[in-house]
Amino acid sequence: MDSVSNLKIAVLINTPPDETDFQSVVRECFREAFASIAPTGEVDFYDPVVERKFPDASRYDLVVLSGGKIDAACSDPWVLGVLDYVRITARDLPKTKILAVCWGHQAVSRAFGGQVRPVPAGEITAIEDIRLTDAGMKFFPFAATSGSYRAIELHSGEVYTPPPGFISLAENQECFINDTNNVLTFQAHPEISHELASKLILEEDKKHSRNSSAEVLGIDRPTEGLKLLERVLQWLSE
């Protein structure tokens, strides 16, 4: 990998356009997060949905699969294109690492033989303490003492069966790394700041008229997304 100052990152925005500003919010979250931890790095965005554009992975240190508002189990042509791209990149360009979040986590699992499904209890919008496995505590030393990392979850689908050749770094199929060490996935959103996470949780609570306390909502303690992404940057050279 190049040094952090020369870091090159490609982000695939994996969501169809709609009447909201969701796509621009996704871009801004990644732009701000990487600017915080790699301010001189280069971040490029690609649209695999409408433009069907994919990065030349050989030009990048890291390819990121974003979240998205579509079923990761569907067979839309662009979804199948993302799955093929991930498989080919991981196989043919192992020096380029792949990071996948939320929908991307599910898509990667499907691409390599795992199973995804709708969340049985319905859509999840919550800040959660995600419990680590023994392997996860070794991979995320900053979280070894607590045994968990804290991040926001925003999803209606989940990984039901993990893909062969992937190691669980967190319980409940929340985080995987493959055994060739070039694909890392999170169900949670490390790119979303604590401020935005808190805003989203409060809006969801207000929508359902719960008006819960900050403690009940889980927004009283900061999320650890930047710590997770800092660990991702360290991983690029491992």
UniProtKB/Swiss-Prot annotation:
CDD domains: GATase1_1 (cd01741). Residues 8-238 form the Glutamine amidotransferase type-1 domain. Disruption phenotype: Affects the production of 2-(2-(2-carboxyacetamido)propanamido)benzoic acid and downstream compounds and accumulates 2-(2-aminopropanamido)benzoic acid. Belongs to the peptidase C26 family. InterPro entries: ChyE-like (IPR044992), Class_I_gatase-like (IPR029062), GATASE (IPR017926). Glutamine amidotransferase-like protein; part of the gene cluster that mediates the biosynthesis of the yellow pigment chrysogine. the NRPS chyA mediates the condensation of anthranilic acid and alanine into the intermediate 2-(2-aminopropanamido)benzoic acid. The remainder of the pathway is highly branched yielding at least 13 chrysogine-related compounds. The active site is at C102 (nucleophile), H189, E191. The keyword Hydrolase applies. One of its GO terms (molecular function) is hydrolase activity. This is Glutamine amidotransferase-like protein chyE. Keywords: Glutamine amidotransferase, Hydrolase. Gene3D superfamilies: 3.40.50.880. Pathway: Pigment biosynthesis. Its EC number is 3.-.-.-. It comes from Penicillium rubens (strain ATCC 28089 / DSM 1075 / NRRL 1951 / Wisconsin 54-1255). One of its GO terms (cellular component) is nucleus. SUPFAM superfamilies: Class I glutamine amidotransferase-like (SSF52317).
